[in-house]
Amino acid sequence: MFRCWSAILILGFIFLASEGRPTKESGYGLKSYQPLTRLRHKQEKSQESSRIKEFLIHDGPFGSCENKYCGLGRHCVINRETRHAECACMDLCKQHYKPVCGSDGEFYENHCEVHRAACLKKQKITIVHNEDCFFEGDNCMAIEYSKMKSMLLDLQNQKYITQENENPNSDDISRKKPLVDQMFKYFDADSNGLVDINELTQVIKQEELNKDLSDCTLYDLLKYDDFNADKHLALEEFYRAFQVIQLSLPEDQRVSITAATVGQSAVLSCAIVGTLRPPIIWKRNNIVLNNLDLEDINDFGDDGSLYITKVTTVHMGNYTCYADGYENVRQTHIFQVNVPPVIRVYPESQAREPGVTASLRCHAEGIPDPQLGWLKNGIDITPKLSKQLTLQANGSEVHISNVRYEDTGAYTCIARNEAGVDEDISSLFVEDSARKTLANILWREEGLGIGNMFYVFYEDGIKVIQPTECEFQRHIKPSEKLLGYQDEVCPKAEEDEVQRCVWASAVNVKDKFIYVAQPTLDRILIVDVQSQKVVQAVSTDPVPVKLHYDKSHDQVWVLSWGSMEKTSPTLQVITLASGNVPHHTIHTQPVGKQFDRVDDFFIPTPTLIITHMRFGFILHKDESALHKIDLETMSYIKTINLKDSRCIPLSLAYTHLGGYYFISCKADITGATPPQLVVDSVTDSIIGFNSDVTGTPYVSPDGHYLVSVNDVKGLVRVQYITIRGEILDAFDIHTNLHISDLAFQPSFTEAHQYNIYGSSSQQTDVLFVELSSGKVKMIKSLKEPLKTEDWPWSQKNRHIQGSGLFGQYLMTPSKDSLFILDGRLNKLNCEITEVQKGNTVVWVGDA
């Protein structure tokens, strides 16, 4: 008997010695494997060892496991109380990995675990010869599954670093693909391009992965990432499992140009493709758009396209798209917004006597710049051009010298661009003075009556001046009564020896009314243009100093200081400003429940092609922020924080070409002035500094020119803004004039161009600059301006006022005079003396 068991024991040792593991190489070492086979049931080794041990170590007279066979999953134990041999469920099985499925649907690491479970559950569990249980159950949660895959990548990465001598801190995304390629090559032991369950089993055994992966195993790769459910993993499925993204972008689509017409909707489609492409991220001016909940860019679509629901000029510019996490593959969309032409002609009608000169002008704006043409009575005038009939300023002006009766007609200006066509008619009547027609009468009344006048508010009341002949049309004295009231225009103050007026700011309301602030009387006067009389006084908060007419909403905004020391500044609004109704002010909603911190406000001015402005900004004293307001509801919307840029805003300018705000910042404690900030109105985000440009910004009416004035440096910088919203450097002008104010005037020699005139706060000259060429000229000897202490209402102690879209005249005051400049000839037209402190000037008229 003993010999028999000795033989069995020796055979057991031989069997154990023969069951070893294949030699591992560095990292994953398995190069081949034996296919997984199903073995017949036999007594587990741990149970055999127990029986042998019981035989070799006799346990006394009461019980022995020598002849006790307990069956699979159980072993023999001696009951400590009865000292008899009994069968009990095995405490544990020998660690080895040979996974099988039980008939109870559970997954087991080996046969022994099946039998042990049957014993513990007291039910019959057989081995099922398929792998269905490998893919059932939900013990492997998503977070654990992700951790398992990360661990596999880390293991492979260690080998990759060792073998390839790579830097472990290099880009994870770029390194992931070779790691997964190597891992798949190792898993695919038979190199057939597919990984099956047997190969996964061998990897688990080889790497002892079953000890480290908690509730997840390699079989979960087949469970969750076998995309076509063929119970094999191909390389593409491996890429999917480990999120190896292979993206492609055709070379000819790296830059895409898209054009849309204002008012339409637009779709920008990202051409980046690839299996498992992550969500597409869109940026504008390096600001991510996807999570901003924008009103007009609010649906990115399942395909990652960018949708703009209603295109405006603010949307023009560059947009970039890329797959999330893969910013190195990006597409740039150059988005151009086309705007149909909008035309204005001047004059609408005119009468001329034979032998004089007539001029018909046409101004057109659109994107791109429109091409102009002229018809006379419906027939193209180009074939009829001569010395007597010429086109000037790139076709924007018809010039007729020595007019004849046959020149009478309807002259139609036509503007065309890619987005559309517009036209308008300017009528010319050639008649001698003896045949005065109704058209002639109407034209003369329009030209010499209430329109095309400068209104000057000065110490001795209000003067209405016709600029061509420098004639007074009306003088409203301080003692004149308001129409229908007993109040005087400027009541005599007790401390004044003579009755005089104090004015601050004034605005033109649709050429119908002029609103003008009287800061020492805490009120606004309304001047009726038709009757040239003061018709109403509107009470305001103390010391109203700044007015702005919001044409989009027919509102006049009023900034009052509260006192000369600016102790309690407030904002008020007069609604229905152009209506023939009694007017009053209403307060705006306080920002942060604080009325007394308002230092200034900014509302963009509408243009010929952009007629509606929806938002404005409030500036608080010494605060690094812009407070956005809804002009329609007069309520606060949000705050744009400028602290990170260390900018306390002083003044703003706006261009509709790309929708940029340019912000000049207050000098810091060292006296250094930070560069201008640029804010994108689409996202309300700071997109950076405007290069190294500093100073007060001004933007031309067409939005194309940004002129920045830095008095400290004596520098005027001109930048050009393209129809794609690009900001380009143009030229610099060095001057010691100390610019007080700027006025833009359309060029008389070039269509679609502007000139600027700059008045001086200290000197007697006016600066002229032709923006298209950089040509500079000085108009000299305009006498000294008001002293700054005599004009406390703003920093512009010498105002300069243009005369509208077609006007050739500008007005600027000195201390005791008015100067009218001829912008067409770039020279002084006339001086009007005995006008003291006439620094409040308004133009009324179409010209």
Curated annotation (Swiss-Prot):
GO terms for cellular component: extracellular region. Residues 1-20 form the signal peptide. Ca(2+) 2 binds at D226, N228, D230, H232, E237. Residues 250-338, 341-426 form the Ig-like domain. InterPro entries: EF-hand-dom_pair, EF_Hand_1_Ca_BS, EF_hand_dom, Ig-like_dom, Ig-like_dom_sf, Ig-like_fold, Ig_sub, Ig_sub2. The keyword Transmembrane helix does not apply. Residues 81-135 form the Kazal-like domain. This is Follistatin-related protein 5. It comes from the Eukaryota. Ca(2+) 1 binds at D188, D190, N192, E199. Keywords: Calcium, Disulfide bond, Glycoprotein, Immunoglobulin domain, Metal-binding, Repeat, Secreted, Signal.
